[in-house]
């Protein structure tokens, strides 16, 4: 069965695999700002997007606003199960989600035919998550900053979602390593398909 994907821009995806609909890192409403204020970085949506219906799972890679965007999360049904990094779990707990599973790198979530393994991701400043998602029919790897967990063993992955450019800021250094990591992902996963994400 084919994987269906809708890209919302930035880090946001709606994926459907084996009839399971997973919303990842959505930014659908309002401006995107980072502490200490919008004078540093401010993102604006050209148009607000309605939250998709029939979501089976909300998957959050990081607690930063471009991954766990509070105005967007406020408009999503709080009874939807959430899988999240440690920092993202704090965000959704504060907003009122009731079914939160926190995964640290190396930990796994299992539910019927769905298996989600957290991998070590970017350090912004704490270690955040990438994920390997498996069902009986499909497999996906996603890590939004291009940080590859060196403990992952070679295996076949159907779909890899990754940035494909490197990006640096004077204060933060290189915090997106897509161009650097892409050859490693190709060798490690031999993916059928690659989707490029942006931040």
What are these regions (language model features)?
Residues 31, 63-68, 89-92, 107-110, ...:
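Active-site environment of divalent metal-dependent phosphoester hydrolases
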Residues 2-4, 76-82, 138-140:
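Short active-site oxyanion
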Residues 20-59, 71-75, 148-155:
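Pre-active-site segment of Zn-dependent metallo-hydrolases
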Residues 8-18, 110-161, 176-181:
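Catalytic core of the metallo-beta-lactamase
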Residues 20, 78-81, 97, 189-193:
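A short helix->loop->beta-strand "cap" motif at the edges of active sites that frequently abuts
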Residues 44-109:
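Active-site HxH/HxHxD metal-binding segment of metal-dependent hydrolases
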Residues 24-25, 54-68, 83-86, 141-146, ...:
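Active-site neighborhood of phospho(di)ester-bond hydrolases with catalytic His/Asp-centered motifs
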Residues 87, 148-199:
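Cap/insert and terminal regions of metallo-dependent hydrolase folds
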